[in-house]
Amino acid sequence: MKREAIAYEAEYKEKVKDRPQMTLSQLAEIYLEDYKTNRKPTSYALTKQNIYSYILPTLGNMNIEELSPIIIKKWQNHLLTLGRSQSSIKAYNTSFNSMLNWAVKYCGLSQNPFKVTGVTGTIRKRLEFLEENEWKKLNDVISDKFDKALFNLLFFSGIRIGEARALTKDDMDFTTNTITISKTHNLVSGISSPKTKNSYRKVVIPEQACKYIKEMFDAFYTLPEYPFQFRIPRTVAAHLKSYCIKAGVTVITPHGFRHSHASMLIRRQVPINAIASRLGDTVAEVLRTYSHCYKEQDSEIAALLETI
């Protein structure tokens, strides 16, 4: 690897002698301008934050042709000193790599040094979710009406937390116990269209979950337009962690309820098309995300057949 990097460095210096000057900061400006027109606001905001917070402060004044593998490697090592998670480091690397790939295609950058260094960081593969018996223990210790309503909604519907935060009273039909998903919410762009066209859907939930939601509504003196935005996400996550610890169950994030719901349906052998429709995903996305559940199910079926 070291010999390859040195050779690559020498090749870089030879190629960049007559190249026009462009700093990484200048590249970032035009790259993000293009990125903004082709991506959703949330994706743009996250990419911009990655670039301005973790790339430009150390490398912004450099000519893009001077970004050799050695420099990229030093930057990657610097990230390790910041105490960031592996998934965050992966995101910073991916944003940087994508920007340089764009520069190769549109700005005449000779080569992308990430082809030598690779992208560092890892994505957490293990999904945190609750077994059904854990959910019952957790639900028993939830005392706050807002938390009770939100967590029951998330567990029994599998909707995304952003979709829950975008719900209005009109989106909930308590006669049929049906929730209509037609929008989502995030702290960057506020209310916006759902993640994909598959995300537009109607989801039926148990009557008991609806009862908790109605009780929460009744507790408000004046019902907000978006009731589930009553608490900020950080507070919701902190409350959930506290409840999980108190109940002695797996500590999950609010998104973990979505994984819990999907895993529960898979283990009850609900058809995958129905699961995908309920989650607002494609069948391929369900298989990719929850393949471990299907493998476990296959093992259980094989063990059952051995007894025949």
Predicted features by range, described:
Residues T176, P206-T250:
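Active-site/catalytic core of tyrosine-dependent DNA strand-transfer enzymes
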Residues P20, L32-P113, R124, R231-T235, ...:
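N-terminal core-binding DNA-recognition domain of tyrosine site-specific recombinases/integrases
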Residues Y92, W135, F146-K148, P233, ...:
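Short, leucine-enriched amphipathic alpha-helices that occur as contiguous helical runs
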Residues K137, G190-S193, T289-I308:
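DNA/chromatin major-groove-contacting recognition/catalytic segments
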Residues K90, K105-Q111, K115-L167, T175, ...:
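Basic, Lys/Arg- and aromatic-enriched nucleic-acid-binding interface segment
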Residues N133, A166-E215:
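Conserved tyrosine-mediated DNA breakage-rejoining catalytic core shared by Y-recombinases
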Residues M1-Q21, T196:
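Short, surface-exposed polybasic/aromatic micro-patch for ligand or macromolecular engagement
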